[in-house]
Amino acid sequence: MRVKVRGFASFREVMGREVQIELSDGSRMRDLLEALCSNHDGLREALFRPRGELREEVTLLWKGHGTDPSESMEIVLEDGDEVAILPPFSGG
């Protein structure tokens, strides 16, 4: 199956604006992020803490909607899904 991933701000600098990733059927969000990390230097450190947990300041959008950080890594992806990776928001 093929999943489209869009990177924003600092993630765009590391992985580019948009990439297509081929995954096995039944793959989860964690599998997608691991595949991305293996292809883009510096992405693992930006996404994950040293013990492998997704950094809480990273926002994942799946099918245009925010994901629950406690459950996002176990989302089962489908062919044609779109995932966006956003860095922390700031402003005043």
Q: Model regions: which residues?
A:
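Ubiquitin-like/PB1-type beta-grasp interaction modules and other compact soluble beta-rich domains
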Residues: 1-91
